[in-house]
Amino acid sequence: MRRSPSRSNNNFAVPNCSTNSNSSQQQLTTPSDDLNSNEPNDPDDSRSLPTIKKFNNKHSINNYNTLASAGKNNNNKRASNDNLLIPGENAHKQKIYTKDENLKSLYLDIDVSVAKALSSSATAPKLINTARTSSTTTATTSNNILTSPSYRESNYSSPSSYSFSSYYSSATSASSSTSSFLKSSGLSSRVKSPSSSVKAGSFGAPSSPTSGIPNPKSSKKPIFLRRYSHDTSSNEGLDIDVAIEKLLQVGESREITKTSKKKNFPFHSWEIQLICYHAREIFLNQPTLLRLQAPIKVVGDVHGQFNDLLRILKLSGVPSDTNYLFLGDYVDRGKNSLETILLLLCYKIKYKDNFFMLRGNHESANVTKMYGFYDECKRRLSSKVWKMFVDVFNTLPLAAIIQDKIFCVHGGISPDLHDMKQIEKVARPTDIPESGLVTDLLWSDPDPQVTDWSENDRGVSYTFSKRNVLDFCAKFKFDLILRGHMVVEDGYEFFARKKFVTIFSAPNYCGEFHNWGAVMSVTTGMMCSFELLKPRALKNKKKLYKTKV
C-alpha cells in the first residue's frame, strides 16, 4: 500500500534568496541537492497567490498572434528580434498596493504536514485602489445591481465589440468615478443574512437537498445581474447568491454526468452570458500581474472535476471566510467543466477582492477544442456559450506575487522575462501566442535532466533547469516559485532545493491516476502548509507517472 503523503512532518525554512551566486553554484554541485523529501525526478508544477500592487502602465505589449495549435511543434529557437517588447498604449492602467515593509524580512517557512487550517479570524489581503480608463459606466445603486450589455444574446460578438452599460459596483464606491476595484476589508464584515429570491426569468433554486458548503447571503446588498440594462421596468436577471447555491446543490445531488443533456442544465444561456460579461469586466479592471498578501490559499489544476472542487471548498474553507488564488486549468478532461468554471466565476463576481484566478494553458480556444470543453459546451448548451467563456479566458491575469516572496504562475518561468513590468504591460484581452513570454508563463516546465533552457517535448515553450530557477529567484528576490500544469503523485512536489513547487488539485486525475490533490496554505507569517485531498477508491488502480497536462 502506497505511503500517504500526509504522514510527512517536515518543517523547513526556504533559504533566503540573498545568498550570493558563488555559494549557490557550489551548493548545486553537492550530492545533497537531490535529497529533499519531495524532490521531483521529472518536471513538476506549482501555482500562485493573491495581492495586488501599484504601478502606472505607460506602455503595453501588443497582442501576439493566436496560438495556431495547442500541440503544434516548433523548434523554440527565437531570433533576437522575437524577444523585443513592442511598446503600445495600455488602456487598462493599474496601481498596486503599498507593500508592508515589516514583512519583507520574513523567511518563508513551509510545513508539509497535512491540512493545517488557517484561523477563521484571518483578515483579507490589503489591496489598493486602481483607476482604469474604460468606456463602461458605473451604475450607482444601493443593492449592487449589475446590468448586461445592450445587445441580444443572438448577436453575441467578439470582445472588441463589447458595449457594457455598467459593471460591478459596490455601494460604498459608486460615488466616485475612480472607485477601487479592490478594497481593503476585513473578512469579519462579511456577515450574510438569508438569501433573497431570484427575480423573474431565472430558474428558481433547486429543490434538491442543501449543499454541505455554506453560501452566506446578504439581503442588504444582493448582487443582481440585470438582463436588460436599458429597461428599468424589467426585473429580469440573475441573483449571484441563487446561482452559487444552485451549483452547490447540483454538486450535492450528484446529478451531473458526462451524458447530461441540455434540458438538465440548471442555467439559461442568457444567464451564463451575464456571468461571463461581468466576470470579464472585473478581470479587466484588475492587473495582469496580481500582487497579493497573505493569508491566502492556492489551488492548482482542477480540470472540470467539479465534485473535487467542492471537496476543496469543504477542506480549505468557503470564499466568504478564505482568500483564494487559483492557478488555472479549470476546464477540459474532467466531466463537469461547465459547472466548475461557472462556480468559480460566480465566486469571482461575489468576492472580487478576495478570490483570484490566473490563466492556465487550457484557458485557450484551441486547447479547449482539443481536450473536451468545446464538446461539452456544444453537447449540453451551444457553441455560442463556449465562445462566451473563451472571451473571459482572454482577460484572465497571467501571474501573481504574494508578499514579494512567492511568484505564482500556471506553467513556469521564461528566458524572455527580465523585468516584472513586462508581465504588467501585457494588454488584455489576448490570445495565447505560439511563442514568447505569455506562452512560457503558461506552458514551460522544469526538468532536472537539463542544465539550461531546452526544447520542451510538448512542442511548445521551453524546459528549464535548477540553475535557471535559482537564478530567477535571486534576480527577483523570490523565496519560492509556485505553479501547477502537471499532475504529481502526492499533490505537491518540490524542485531546485525547494525553491520551486508544483501543486495539483485534481485527485485521481481523469479517473485514471491514484494521485492526491493538494492546496497550499500561506499564513500572514508566511508559514506554508499543504492541505491534501485523498483520491477516491479505484477499481483498477494505475501507477502514476508524472503527466503533463
UniProtKB/Swiss-Prot annotation:
Gene Ontology cellular-component terms listed: cytoplasm; nucleus
Cofactor binding, per record: Binds 2 manganese ions per subunit.
GO MF annotations, alphabetized: metal ion binding; phosphoprotein phosphatase activity; protein serine/threonine phosphatase activity
Cofactor(s) essential for the protein: Mn(2+)
Any one GO BP annotation for this protein: negative regulation of pheromone-dependent signal transduction involved in conjugation with cellular fusion
Catalyzed reaction equations: O-phospho-L-seryl-[protein] + H2O = L-seryl-[protein] + phosphate; O-phospho-L-threonyl-[protein] + H2O = L-threonyl-[protein] + phosphate
CDD domains in UniProt: MPP_PP1_PPKL
Biased composition (Polar residues): 1-13, 205-217
InterPro entries named among the record's database cross-references: Calcineurin-like_PHP_ApaH, Metallo-depent_PP-like, PP1_catalytic_subunit, PPPtase_PPZ/Ppq1, Ser/Thr-sp_prot-phosphatase, STPPase_N
Keyword hit for rRNA-binding: no
Region annotation Disordered: where it falls in the sequence: 1-50, 64-85, 133-158, 189-219
Active-site annotation: 362
Residue ranges of the TM segments: none
Biased composition regions of type Low complexity, renumbered to the chain: 16-32, 68-83
EC supergroup of this enzyme: hydrolase
Positions with a binding annotation for Mn(2+) 1: 301, 303, 329
Residues the entry annotates as binding Mn(2+) 2: 329, 361, 410, 485
Similarity annotation: Belongs to the PPP phosphatase family. PP-Z subfamily.
Function summary: Phosphatase involved in the regulation of protein synthesis. Affects translational accuracy.
UniProt name for this protein: Serine/threonine-protein phosphatase PPQ
Organism: Saccharomyces cerevisiae (strain ATCC 204508 / S288c) (Baker's yeast)
Lineage: Eukaryota, Fungi, Dikarya, Ascomycota, Saccharomycotina
